[in-house]
From Swiss-Prot:
Cross-referenced PANTHER family: PROTEIN HGH1 HOMOLOG
The organism's taxonomic lineage, starting at the top: Eukaryota, Fungi, Dikarya, Ascomycota, Saccharomycotina
GO process terms (BP): chaperone-mediated protein folding
Gene Ontology molecular function: any one: translation elongation factor binding
Entry keyword annotation includes Glycosyltransferase: no
Segments of skewed composition (Acidic residues): 371-394
Protein name: Protein HGH1
Other noteworthy facts: Present with 20800 molecules/cell in log phase SD medium.
Keywords: Acetylation
Family listed: Belongs to the HGH1 family.
Source organism (scientific name): Saccharomyces cerevisiae (strain ATCC 204508 / S288c)
Residue(s) carrying N-acetylthreonine: T2
Keyword Acetylation: yes
Stretches the record annotates as Disordered: 357-394
InterPro entries hit by this protein: ARM-type_fold, Hgh1, Protein_HGH1_C, Protein_HGH1_N
Length: 394
């Protein structure tokens, strides 16, 4: 089998389009698992061949592009593969993002997965500088591209267009071909880098809106796990710079806090007294009877980590106290049996309810078990980068 695969992968370099098509069609199934090493032959030449096939304006059919991108998705766990894909003056990256933005592209969703996998490396930051020419026409920087749909996209910047795809394209409302859900993971990973997260927390010139505010509504889309998970991580990563916290909390145009708290709240949180309830953000007062917490503990943990990051400044702690965050966390701790959630709840309480220097005694949160939890002294949350989870396609 090994010799046959080695021979088959050589056909990707054939000058005959029909031969290349047969080769890639038969190689897709070998791109995941131990057999994927065949694509590393001859200094990764098969990867370069596949990239050329995908970008071929004459022979890059819908099927070839789908198969080629699927192979790259499965191989992108390899850092060297990611480097190859992002090399060549980022030409393939430009091709990829503009194909995602092409609303007639039936392969947009699989391309979103590839883009999210590529965002594990800082080379992805080049996407922040990718722009179409002033007219958004079909030929740009030597690439043959679909004309930009100016009714949908009001900016020539790739990052703005990707954001519009994600926000407007939920549930395939923008195009029947794509939901753009995996852009959430792309946003999460690019926000690990300072330049990336600055994009999300600064007002953008083309629409006068802070991008993070567009994402907040998706923290409660319980039918879209990928969106919720990616958006929760993007919010958390956007809070790594403490000097921005006060603005993000108090700017009413952003309105950050309610969308961090809503996923951890339930209508069954019955022991929040009237005064504390009154101090909660408006969105958390009088929750509907069917309001439930996010069903995924890991996503709840991500929001709790965001709260911890907001606790790293005095102004942040005071704001969270004023907004009755402690009673909400107390109810979460009491009603959800999960070790990771419980630990994070205790850490938040230690930050919020121990009081500032010189303050008097404060309320203790009761333990769920007989053993005393060790008190956490540190007031700083370590920057916890996202796990380098690579999506594979079967």
């Amino acid at each position: 089998m090994t010799s046959q695969l080695n021979e088959l992968v050589e056909f990707l370099h054939s000058p005959q389009p029909a031969v290349r098509q047969i080769a890639i069609d038969n190689l897709v199934g070998f791109s995941a698992g131990p057999t994927s090493k065949v694509f590393k032959n001859d200094s990764y030449r098969p990867i370069k061949d596949i990239i050329k096939m995908i970008m071929d304006p004459e022979h890059g059919t819908r099927v070839i592009i789908q198969q080629g991108v699927t192979i790259l998705v499965n191989l992108s766990e390899d850092k060297l593969v990611r480097n190859i894909i992002l090399s060549d003056d980022k030409k393939f990256l430009k091709f990829l993002v503009w194909k995602i933005v092409d609303l007639t592209n039936p392969n947009a969703d699989i391309m979103c997965i590839l883009l999210s996998n590529l965002a594990k490396d800082d080379g992805i930051l080049a996407v922040l500088n990718i722009k179409r020419n002033s007219s958004g026409e079909e030929v740009d920087d030597g690439l043959k591209l679909a004309a930009l749909n100016k009714e949908v996209f009001k900016s020539l910047r790739a990052m703005d267009c990707l954001m519009d795809c994600f926000v407007k394209g939920y549930d395939k409302k923008l195009t029947k071909y794509a939901s753009f859900n995996y852009l959430a993971f792309f946003f999460a990973d690019i926000s690990r880098f300072k330049l990336g997260r600055m994009y999300f927390i600064e007002e953008q010139e083309y629409d006068g809106v802070v991008p993070i505010s567009k994402l907040l509504v998706f923290t409660e889309k319980y039918d879209a796990k990928v969106r919720r998970e990616g958006v929760a991580s993007t919010i958390k990563n956007s809070l790594f710079d403490s000097e921005t916290h006060e603005r993000l909390l108090k700017d009413e145009k952003i309105n950050l806090l309610p969308y961090i708290l809503l996923p951890i709240a339930s209508a069954k949180d019955s022991e929040i007294d009237e005064e504390d309830m009154f101090n909660l953000p408006d969105e958390l007062q009088l929750l509907p009877e069917d309001k439930e917490r996010d069903p995924i503990p890991a996503i709840i943990c991500c929001h709790l980590e965001s709260i911890l990051l907001l606790c790293t400044t005095h102004a942040g702690r005071e704001y969270l106290r004023d907004k009755s965050v402690y009673p909400l966390v107390r109810e979460l701790h009491k009603n959800v049996e999960n070790e990771d959630i419980g630990e994070l709840c205790y850490r938040i309480v230690n930050m919020l309810m121990r009081g500032e220097p010189g303050a008097g005694a404060v309320e203790e949160m009761p333990s769920k078990n007989a053993e005393e939890e060790e008190e956490e002294e540190s007031e700083e949350e370590e920057d916890d980068d996202e796990e380098d989870e690579i999506v594979e396609v079967a």
